[in-house]
Amino acid sequence: MAKDIDWGNLPFSYMETSKSFVATWKDGAWDEGTLTSDHTITISECACVLQYAQTCFEGLKAYTTSDGKVVTFRPDLNAERMESSCKRLEMPVFPKDKFVQAVIDVVKANLDYVPPYGSGATLYIRPFMFGSNAVIGVKPATEFQFRILVTPVGPYFKGGVKPIKVRISDRDRAAPHGTGDIKAGLNYAMSLYNIVDAHNCGYAENMYTDPATHTYIEETGGANILFVDKEGTLLTPKSDSILPSITRRSLITVARDILGMKVEERRINKNELEGFVECGLCGTAAVISPIGQVDDHEKSIKFPSGMEEIGPVMKKLRETLTGIQMGTVKGPEGWVVEIK
C-alpha cells in the first residue's frame, strides 16, 4: 500500500522511511548486517569521520515500471565504484554481492515509499560508509559502519527538463592526482561554498575546468557533462579527476549501441563550447538536465537548443535511458534489477 504522499510535488529532499540497512566492521570483519528502524547514529565526538572526513557514498534509484514492477538500475556498478572509493580512503570493502542484496532488501522493506509509475518521482537510495571509532591522530579508523538509507524524491532541478544556466568556476573541484575520481564526502564539502555562491549569482551549477591548467572542461559539482557537436557526435570530457558516472557510462552505451550515434570521450577545451549545439548534465539525481547557457566571466555561450526546451539529441538520450529504467524500452541484459 503506497503512502499518502503528493508524489507529483515531491522536493529533492530527505524524508524518513520505514527501514535502513546497517552493517558494522569490527575486529577485521563485517557482521551480517540488518535492517533497522532507527535512523539515528550514535558515535564518539572524536570519530574519524568527524575529525578527518573518512567517508564515501553512492547514489542510485528504485522505480516503478510501466507494468507495476519495482526495479533498480545497475546496482552492481555502484558496488564497484564504492569499492574504488573505499580502497582509496583506507576503508574496508563491502562485498559486491552483499551490497546488491542489501540494496534489494532495503527497497523491499520500503515498498510503500516507492513512487508510482508516471509520477516523475523515484526512491533515492544512498549507500554510505564512514570511520566510526575515535581517532585523534591522522590515521584511518579501525571500525566502520556501512549503511543504506532510502527516501522518495522529486526532480533534482525544480524545472525538470527545462534548460539551466551554469557558470565556469575559477575554483577547483578536485586536486591533480587527488580524489576527484572517487565519491568521497570531502569532494562535496569542497564544493559547498562554490554552489551556494553560484546560486546567489543566479546559476544552477558550477562547471569546473581541470585544476592543472584551468583550460579543459571536467564536470560540475554533482554531475558529469555531455556535449553534442554540429555533426551530431556525443562528446564527453576525458580526465583522471572526473568521477566515473554510471549514468554517463550508460548513456554512452545507449548513444552508440541503441541510437547508432558517434561518441567521443576526449579532452574538451573550454574554447570549443561555442561550436557545440547542445549541452547537458548527467547523473543519478538529474538523469539528463539540459544546459542552455554557460557563462565564462564576461562571455556568455548560448546553445542553439535555447533556454526553453531540451535539445533533440539530449531529449532522445534521456527518453531512451529513462525508458529502459521504466520498462518501456528494451535495454541491455542485466541493467535493470527487479526487487522481488
List where the protein language model places each region:
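Helix-start/capping segments and mature chain N-termini
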Residues: 1-106, 128, 135-340
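Charged, gly/pro-rich active-site loop segments
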Residues: 106-120
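Extended, Lys/Arg-enriched charged tracts that mediate electrostatic binding to polyanionic substrates
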Residues: 116-130
